[in-house]
């Protein structure tokens, strides 16, 4: 009976360990006031060692899914330009497969400049989609909802 209980316990622990979700990127969101009505919305990706997060802009031969941002319309906010990337971009190339990618390791900051139309407090809301890979595998794309107070 003890052997059966031990075997079941080992099996359950084994299944639990294999079912763990890998999440090699953590996100933080904030806003920085630039002037009276101008803010920078900052989306910071902290990437675990050995993993890569893909840039929004990829070469033509890339198969990686680029990071993308989709902001909800807000009558109190104007979006000023595109999301900028601040970090050390790496250009990856695999000549055997004939593919390349623009990617980040460790940390990258995505910045969207916005202008308030009035004095009311509001949030920038939306979602981001990204994919991460290491040298052995790529994880399926993930979507993260965001809400950032201005």
Predicted regions and their residues:
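Extracellular/lumen-exposed scaffold segments
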Residues: 18-150
């Amino acid at each position: 009976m003890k052997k059966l209980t031990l075997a079941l316990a080992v099996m359950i622990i084994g299944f639990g360990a294999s079912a763990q979700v890998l999440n090699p990127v953590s996100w933080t969101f904030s806003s920085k006031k630039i002037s009276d009505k101008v803010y920078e919305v900052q989306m910071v990706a902290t990437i675990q060692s050995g993993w890569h997060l893909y840039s929004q802009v990829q070469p033509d031969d890339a198969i990686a899914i680029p990071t993308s941002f989709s902001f909800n319309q807000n009558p109190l906010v104007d979006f000023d330009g595109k999301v900028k990337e601040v970090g050390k971009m790496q250009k990856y190339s695999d000549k055997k497969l004939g593919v390349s990618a623009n990617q980040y390791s460790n940390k990258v900051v995505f910045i969207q400049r916005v202008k308030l139309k009035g004095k009311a407090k509001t949030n920038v809301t939306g979602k981001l989609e990204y994919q991460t890979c290491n040298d052995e595998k790529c994880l399926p794309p993930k979507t993260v909802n965001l809400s950032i107070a201005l």
